[in-house]
């Protein structure tokens, strides 16, 4: 039986990117295509398993594109799909809000 999707747009968005790591993965991919190791290095404290699971979820949701190259050693690259890129203004708003909040805390 298929689970019913939420009707609230905020709930839908939070379901897709509400996880701490997902929003940070999107932040990093907004600067361009990255390999798994590059993402892992830039995300302090994330385990390999958690990064793998988040990337798989984001690929399944249509936010991230995974491209595997038939090379030795194997190479896999991740990039944002159009739906992922559409989150750029959301992250920009978060940056502005975070900067304003930081200033208020001084």
Where are these predicted regions, by residue range?
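Amphipathic alpha-helical dimerization/coiled-coil segments
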Residues: 5, 9, 86-106
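N-terminal helix-turn-helix DNA-binding core of bacterial DNA-binding proteins
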Residues: 8-50, 74-77
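Residues within the DNA-recognition helix of helix-turn-helix
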Residues: 54
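Conserved catalytic-core motifs of GNAT/GCN5-like acyltransferases
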Residues: 67
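Basic, amphipathic "hinge/linker" alpha-helix immediately C-terminal to the N-terminal HTH DNA-binding motif
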Residues: 70-93
